[in-house]
Design a protein with these regions (language model features):
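Cationic, low-complexity basic patches in intrinsically disordered or flexible, solvent-exposed regions
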Residues: 8
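Short N-terminal edge-element motif at the start of the domain
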Residues: 12-68, 72
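Intrinsically disordered, low-complexity linker and terminal regions at domain boundaries
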Residues: 61-89
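Beta-strand-rich cores of mature extracytoplasmic or soluble domains
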Residues: 78-206
Length: 206
């Protein structure tokens, strides 16, 4: 009832009005691929999303809890607040920040100039800042295990990225022949030397 015996006012809702979805930490969303593929991601802290590996089981929290993340990316909350990415499983507890904390360190690494990023050896900390990694060995371990943070300023390019690299990640991303065989001979040599330093058998890969 309205206070002090006041009258109720008519509330008019425009059915065409865009309603913002809830920002739900720990919830799981579906990203539609370009060729019918489906990718499932969980919203973690700092606008970071963990992309699940292939699922074995029903679409429920129990199945996802037993499935590891294949890769990580950061993006703004626009696609979830606007319902572009469909929520398929609600968060068991969206207030449990510690439970949905993204990995403490994720490598700052890109395949178009691997030597540059390996020389820099920088990592994204969970606080959102970029720091020098404690050692090159640790940086290489992060890269080879797929603990790389991909930062996207728009959600539209994410399906294309996943279609290209999701399968056999991180090898599919690190060993990108389009980049390795392009550019000057000096550039190509630098990239193959990085692959060797990362522990890849160049003879079998190229």
């Amino acid at each position: 009832m309205p206070p002090n015996g006041g009258k109720l006012h008519n509330i008019i809702i425009n059915k065409n009005q865009s309603i913002m979805a809830k920002y739900e930490l720990g919830a799981i969303y579906k990203i539609n691929g370009r060729s019918g593929e489906l990718y499932y991601v969980r919203l973690l802290t700092n606008d970071c999303y963990g992309v699940f590996s292939s699922l074995e089981g029903e679409l429920n929290e129990e199945t996802f809890a037993q499935t590891h993340y294949r890769l990580y990316f950061s993006c703004n909350s626009f696609p979830i607040k606007r319902g572009i990415w469909e929520k398929v499983v609600s968060s068991p507890n969206c207030t449990d920040i510690a439970r949905w904390q993204r990995p403490q360190y994720l490598a700052n690494f890109a395949n178009f100039n691997m030597k540059l990023f390996l020389d820099q050896c920088r990592v994204f900390h969970e606080d959102g800042n970029l720091y020098q990694c404690e050692s090159k060995e640790e940086f290489i371990r992060l890269v080879k295990s797929g603990k790389i943070l991909f930062c996207f300023n728009t959600y539209e390019i994410i399906p294309d990225f996943l279609m290209r690299y999701y399968k056999d990640f991180p090898n599919s991303y690190i060993v990108n022949k389009d980049f390795i065989h392009s550019g000057t001979l000096e550039y190509q040599k630098e990239q193959t030397n990085v692959l060797k330093e990362l522990g890849f058998d160049i003879g079998n890969l190229l």
